[in-house]
Amino acid sequence: MPKGEGKLIAQNKKAHHDYFIEETYEAGIVLQGTEIKSIRAGKVNLKDSFAKVEKGEVFLHNMHISPYEQGNRYNHDPLRTRKLLLHRREINKLIGYTKEQGYTLVPLKLYIKNGFAKVLLGVGKGKKKYDKREDMKRREAQREIERAFRERQKL
């Protein structure tokens, strides 16, 4: 399966709006207790999450996994920092990217592949306000073109 394939659980739609995504990496996640049950139930939010390289390891911050309903006292902290599993070579590349000004690591998708939870991590450069406006204009123009084609097809 190519990167980003598998049963999609959550997607960070805002990431493509806020960042130019240049490269993607597939990473495993170190989970505790009932977290995988909540993930399989789809109770995950990637909205404000980001990844950081700390002491040669990659950690995912602010990813919200809701507590499992039947988990009682074994439940986890919903916003805890989670370690990501990557090859050393990939981590070294990410260190190089994050040292450059303006680059950040953003989770794009969370999915289950072969029974394991995976995160598609994107290396992104923040968009300025005018870049966002330009993207919106381009999308609107594309919609107008498609609408005109559909009107032509009806006649």
From Swiss-Prot:
Alphabetically ordered keywords of this record: Cytoplasm, RNA-binding
Pfam families per the UniProt record, alphabetical: SmpB
SUPFAM superfamilies registered for this protein in UniProt: Small protein B (SmpB)
Compartments, record wording: Cytoplasm
CDD domains, sorted: SmpB
GO cellular component: cytosol
Domain of life from the UniProt record: Bacteria
Keyword check for NAD: no
MF terms in GO: RNA binding
Biological processes, Gene Ontology terms: trans-translation
Primary location class: cytoplasm
Matches recorded under InterPro entries: SmpB, SsrA-bd_prot, SsrA-bd_prot_CS
Function: Required for rescue of stalled ribosomes mediated by trans-translation. Binds to transfer-messenger RNA (tmRNA), required for stable association of tmRNA with ribosomes. tmRNA and SmpB together mimic tRNA shape, replacing the anticodon stem-loop with SmpB. tmRNA is encoded by the ssrA gene; the 2 termini fold to resemble tRNA(Ala) and it encodes a 'tag peptide', a short internal open reading frame. During trans-translation Ala-aminoacylated tmRNA acts like a tRNA, entering the A-site of stalled ribosomes, displacing the stalled mRNA.
UniProt cross-references to HAMAP family, sorted A to Z: SmpB
UniProt-listed PANTHER family: SSRA-BINDING PROTEIN, TMRNA-BINDING COMPONENT OF TRANS-TRANSLATION TAGGING COMPLEX
Protein name: SsrA-binding protein
Organism field: Geobacillus sp. (strain WCH70)
